[in-house]
């Protein structure tokens, strides 16, 4: 089937998508080179069907998503990639989508910012019963990434992302609350999170931070702005891209975020978990995105007895250990750490409500956070 790849109402390319699998099989024509998704380019800046296919596949629900297999069965969908076609590739992160060449649609009539969407896919992803014999598959849940169970819902006109916990402690939702409290204390722009209970489990909730005019460009996508020369580190290349488009204070904002990640022992700040905001109509860069997705942190998969501030913690995205990454960013970190006096009490208070915790876990995490704050202060001295 032949489609237009679109950005809002701008035609970007003519592409062919396999009807049975949902895979992109050809790029017939590029119509607007400047609007090609940055993430759909190779690292050398080139663009072809292989790079577009990789971008398209990465847009969908990953195979690692908890409960995906059962959800596909309930929705009568053989391949997860087909869910992308069912929702026209629409997302609540950006304004790219596809529409049939022989029956093109208008962006304003279909996008998830201005139009309601079904909860059928969200229900299936959480193992809930489908309310219709013919489920409505047009949902932003189809273009949500990550391995944790999650779903988009509409509440009071707002688009809200709900995300569950994992493992024996189900800790990730509480981690988001701790992270929000940390960012509040330090005066850092971030996406606010709160807790909700649904179906007997506690989940984190946050409102969509993009809109019909503004898109998220992750750091991984952003770094395709320029070809990355062999031997140039990701850190060096990231800074070169920031300088090329003159985003003010981008390096300092990212370094402050990574310093906060050190406090939180965040192990998953990969290049898709932070980024920049761009006007999807003018393509003007608006600045760094607020910090989001900090749940994989605070020793969430570590047994209570093994939690320790000094333990080696892996890091992303520019170094493999927290200590080595801290050395890299230290010259650019400017956080008012004096505001964190007594912050460990707040951490323990938040975790005291976690039903899956064993005795002493909340206090152990709070003590480790306090220790890491002191370690960061020492590195700053």
Residue ranges of predicted features:
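Phosphate/dinucleotide-binding and metal-coordinating scaffold of catalytic cores
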Residues: 1-259, 263-265, 277-381
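Conserved protein-kinase catalytic-loop segment immediately C-terminal to the catalytic Asp
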Residues: 270, 275-277
